[in-house]
Curated annotation (Swiss-Prot):
Interacts (via N-terminus) with ORAI1 (via N- and C-termini); this interaction regulates Ca(2+) influx at the plasma membrane. The active site is at 377 (4-aspartylphosphate intermediate). ATP-driven pump that supplies the Golgi apparatus with Ca(2+) and Mn(2+) ions, both essential cofactors for processing and trafficking of newly synthesized proteins in the secretory pathway. Within a catalytic cycle, acquires Ca(2+) or Mn(2+) ions on the cytoplasmic side of the membrane and delivers them to the lumenal side. The transfer of ions across the membrane is coupled to ATP hydrolysis and is associated with a transient phosphorylation that shifts the pump conformation from inward-facing to outward-facing state. Induces Ca(2+) influx independently of its ATP-driven pump function. The modification Phosphoserine is found at residue 266. The chain crosses the membrane at residues 105-125, 128-148, 230-250, 292-312, 330-350, 749-769, 803-823, 836-853, 873-893, 904-924. The lineage of its organism: Eukaryota, Metazoa, Chordata, Craniata, Vertebrata. This is Calcium-transporting ATPase type 2C member 2. It comes from Mus musculus. Mg(2+) binds at residues 672, 676. Residues 1-104, 149-229, 313-329, 770-802, 854-872, 925-944 are cytoplasmic. Ca(2+) binds at residues 330-331, 333, 335, 766, 770.
């Protein structure tokens, strides 16, 4: 603006004085230069990033015009400076505007936490300082753990920034410079070579045998061959052969191109923006705890209101009744609940860690219990990400199948249908076919890993399975014609190493290209003329293998190109992981639907889907393009029936997950690539692969499978279901005990009767209620039958109707039994004695212990779950029992608790009466079992 103002002022001055002074030549030139510079600045500011779908259609000349760049000399420093003002640096900026202290305070925005804090304040006002400290400590522990989990989960954005390589080779002012990748702007000319990580989205203008590993971006395991020719149609990102994307890796060859998108304007920038905008959803357990907090709040205020009303009717002082009501309400709140929930979740996490599953966020453990949909990426998750040859067809009609997965060399080659295992050249036709694949090859297998292209590695392993792994050493390579995306084949010319002989060509590639170079076909080691009928037969076999989702390679050999002998076809696929098929079956039987969401083509996805039992006769598949074109509401209605989603981008995956969540599903997403990271974050449960997963996917996920074992999800689901039931067991015990204790005190207060329990006895009951017996219910081992149960509904709360009925039933039995003993032992004058309170007190404690025993399971009898299964529970109950006996019989404690000795008959009576709460609970379980058998067998809920 300063230059422009100066220029206009000078023009005005000259205009005023043109009659008196002629314009000097150097001034004219200066004005022209300044005017040109202003135009150049305006022009540079109009240069915009170009979407890959548009850039792929542009010719070299159109690209140069669009970005105002000379393809031979690159941008000038002046142009770069102006463009940076518009486009910024080529990097991702993480927004850390919210301070840490605010994030910590946000953890207190939880109804149960707020209720507990309120209880702590009331405890201080009523001078119950011990209660106040214990409640505050429990809240502090729970809040701190939650904060740490959330703080760690924000690292996924930081990991994504590591995908931008620190340096690159860029052409500027006619010179190739090694510079920081963050300096790139749209229009820069970047040079690429083998091993480079691509620094921005680039439209290629020059290519030499360029292969790019895009597996972290598209999910495709096979490297993509690249070209510099314009494309007629944009298509999806995985088909853009003349565009390379930020963060992907040059596997071989070299190239040069124009930067079309930097930073957040690149495709990885789109992923970054989606991850930044995506919020991790609340888990069902968090929602249940929130609801429980609200229910307990209503219950607490109900007690206060009821007592104040009764006190008002009886004419008692308002303040004293309010104080009693508040104290009882505080006592009713299970302050031990957050700690028990946390301990239960931590123990679940530790158990899962032993099964090689790492959980990063505690509530996620329980969320698995209500997961009813698992959306899984294909490559590296359902499959091993190890290309493997599975089928062979020779030119003379022999068919063979190959066993063994991966690059270990373990497995056999069997002729069909005889299942005869063949080695070496037992079958000449198969031997020659395998030999050609091994010799026309640049891959090396070392320590069960491939060095080179995965497809070539599969051919080397195939040779190893036939004891032909070293046959390549029998030849001396004299020439190589490398593979290119245009010709779709590669060939080598070799000579025998040990003896004089003629050179021979070995070729492999696409069938339609290889057959074009053949004039003969192999028939048991004898070359015969390649007739149209024979060619048609081979073409049909190639189509048949392709329809099974196999990558088909044709092989040939001969003295010269154009006179080769066709040898046959090899079918290669990335096979399913071991145990995946069984896991899918078990999950389906337990009401969990497994869906494949992949960037691969339909044929490949269906082949894997059929192999693992994902696809049935009513299979429905949906492309990423269809997902994008369908409105969210309509998509939510359709996704329930779809088993396979193919050709999907990161944006499509998120849309699919949102649609499933909208339809009421709890969705787990498994993945290993950067392209999965946004979906992993938006899903209710994000599951990343520990070995093959990228750092970005691991940080975005909240669960990691250390060994990449999909079947470990079964154990995780089982654990999640068991944990929720353990939490319900604890809540049932604590609420039934607290309601019974409160009711006894409330009834005695309202009816002007002596209290069955004194202050110290109530304190002892509270210790048992919140102490070891209660805590040990949270560590009950997971029920092995949990996996067979269908996923629980998201709407199911901890305090549901069935649990409330059980709580009220247990509380009623405890109240009735304790009042019976109190009434039986109270003297005729109605005054309470030490024996009266000792009997009532011991009766209540015994009821508590039997109630805890019945709360170990909501559905199974004690003999089914095993009396000695939870040893911590037994030790805690035994400790509580010994403590109670000490309170009764130890003279120092008798003075503190105002108790006296009881006879053996007294203890026998109390034990028999207290066991009624346990017996009644077991009878109720038997009755429910009888009713469930009487009803017709119900199907599991429809898989979502």
């Amino acid at each position: 603006m300063g230059r422009r103002l100066k220029f206009l002022q000078k023009l005005a001055f000259l205009g005023q004085n043109h009659r008196y002074k002629a314009l000097e030549r150097d001034e004219v030139e200066t004005l022209i230069d300044e005017q040109c510079e202003l135009k150049a600045i305006e022009r540079e500011k109009t240069v915009a990033a170009l979407p890959p779908g548009e850039a792929c259609k542009c010719s070299r000349e159109e690209l140069a015009r669009a970005f105002h760049v000379d393809l031979d000399s690159g941008l000038s420093e002046f142009a770069v400076a102006q463009r940076r003002l518009v486009h910024g640096w080529n990097e991702f900026v993480t927004d850390n505007a919210e301070p840490v202290w605010k994030k910590y305070l946000d953890q207190f925005r939880n109804p149960l936490i707020l209720l507990l804090l309120g209880s702590s304040v009331v405890s201080v006002l009523t001078k119950e300082y011990e209660d106040a400290v214990s409640i505050a400590l429990a809240v502090l522990i729970v809040v701190t753990v939650g904060f740490i989990q959330e703080y760690r989960s924000e690292k996924s954005l930081e990991e994504l920034t590591k995908l931008v390589p620190p340096e690159c080779n860029c052409l500027r002012d006619g010179k190739l410079r090694h510079m920081l990748a963050r300096d790139l702007v749209p229009g820069d000319i970047v040079s690429l070579s083998m091993g480079d990580r691509i620094p921005a989205d680039i439209r290629l203008t020059e290519v030499t045998d360029l292969l790019v590993d895009e597996s972290s971006f598209t999910g495709e395991v096979e490297p993509c061959g690249k070209t510099d020719s314009p494309l007629a149609d944009g298509g999806d990102l995985s088909t853009l052969s003349n565009v390379v994307f930020m963060g992907t890796l040059v596997q071989c060859g070299k190239g040069q191109g124009v930067v079309i998108g930097t930073g957040e304007q690149s495709q990885f920038g789109e992923v970054f923006k989606m991850m930044r905008a995506e919020e991790t959803p609340k888990t069902p357990l968090q929602k249940s705890m929130d609801k429980l907090g609200k229910q307990l709040t209503i219950f607490s205020f109900g007690i206060i209101g009821l007592l104040m009303l009764v006190g008002w009717v009886q004419g008692k002082p308002f303040l004293s009744m309010f104080t009693v009501g508040v104290s009882l309400a505080v006592a009713a709140i299970p302050e031990g609940l957050p700690i028990v929930v946390m301990v239960t979740l931590v123990l679940g996490v530790l158990r899962m860690a032993k099964k090689r599953v790492i959980v990063k966020k505690l509530p996620i453990v329980e969320t698995l219990g209500c997961c009813n949909v698992i959306c899984s990426d294909k490559t590296g998750t359902l499959t091993a990400n190890e290309m493997t040859a599975t089928q062979l067809v020779t030119s003379d009609g022999f068919h063979a199948e190959v066993s063994g997965v991966g690059y270990s060399g373990e497995g056999t080659v069997c002729l069909l249908p005889s299942k005869e295992v063949i080695k070496g050249f037992d079958n000449v036709s198969v031997g020659k076919l395998v030999e050609a694949g091994c010799v026309a090859n640049n891959a090396v297998i070392r320590k069960n890993a491939v060095m080179g292209q995965p497809t070539e590695g599969a051919l080397v392993v195939l040779a190893m399975k036939m004891n032909l792994g070293s046959i390549k050493d029998s030849y001396v390579r004299k020439k190589e014609i490398p593979f290119s995306s245009e010709q779709k084949w590669m060939a080598v010319r070799c000579g025998p190493k040990s003896e004089d002989g003629e050179d021979i060509y070995f070729m492999k590639g696409a069938f339609e290209e290889v057959i074009h170079h053949c004039s003969m076909y192999n028939n048991g080691g004898i070359p015969l003329p390649l007739t149209p009928q024979q060619k048609s037969y081979c073409q049909q076999e190639e189509k048949k293998m392709g329809s099974l989702g196999l990558r088909v390679l044709a092989l040939a050999s001969g003295p010269e190109l154009g006179r080769l002998t066709f040898l046959g076809l090899v079918g290669i696929i990335d096979p399913p992981r071991a145990g995946v098929k069984e896991a899918v079956q078990v999950l389906s039987e337990s009401g969990v639907s497994v869906k494949m969401v992949t960037g691969d083509a339909l044929e490949t996805a269906l082949a894997i889907g059929r192999t693992i039992g994902l696809c049935n006769e009513k299979l429905k598949a949906m492309s990423g393009e269809e997902v994008e074109g369908t409105e969210q509401g309509a998509l939510a209605a359709r996704v329930r029936q779809v088993s396979v989603f193919f050709r999907t981008s990161p944006k499509h995956k998120v849309k699919i997950i949102k649609a499933l969540q909208e339809s009421g599903a709890i969705v787990a997403m498994t993945g290993d690539g950067v392209n999965d990271s946004v979906a992993l974050k938006s899903a209710d449960i994000g599951i990343a692969m520990g070995q093959t997963g990228t750092d970005v996917s691991k940080e975005a996920a909240n669960m990691i499978l250390v060994d990449d074992d999909f079947s470990a999800i079964m154990s995780a689901v089982e654990e999640g279901k068991g944990i929720f039931y353990n939490i319900k067991n604890f809540v049932r015990f604590q609420l039934s005990t607290s309601i019974a204790a409160l009711s006894l005190i409330t009834l005695s207060t309202v009816c002007n009767l002596p209290s069955p329990l004194n202050a110290m006895q109530i304190l002892w009951v509270n210790i048992i209620m919140d102490g070891p017996p209660a805590q040990s219910l949270g560590v009950e081992p997971v029920d092995r039958d949990a996996l067979r149960r269908p996923p629980r509904s998201v709407g199911d709360t901890i305090l549901n109707r069935a649990l409330i009925l059980r709580v009220l039933m247990s509380a009623a039995v405890i109240i009735g039994g304790t009042l019976f003993i109190f009434w039986r032992e109270i003297p005729a004058n109605g005054t309470s004695t030490p024996r009266t309170t000792t009997m009532a007190f011991t009766c209540f404690v015994f009821f508590d212990l039997f109630n805890a025993l019945s709360c170990r399971s909501q559905t199974k009898l004690i003999f089914e779950i095993g009396f000695f299964r939870n040893r911590m529970f037994l030790y805690s109950v035994l400790g509580s029992l010994l403590g109670q006996l000490a309170v009764i019989y130890a003279p120092p404690l008798q003075k503190v608790f105002q108790t006296e000795n009881l006879s053996a008959l007294d203890l026998l009576l109390l034990t028999g009466l207290a066991s009624s709460v346990f017996i009644l609970s077991e009878l109720l379980k038997l009755w429910e079992k009888f009713l469930s058998r009487a009803r017709p067998t119900q199907m599991l809920p429809e898989a979502v």
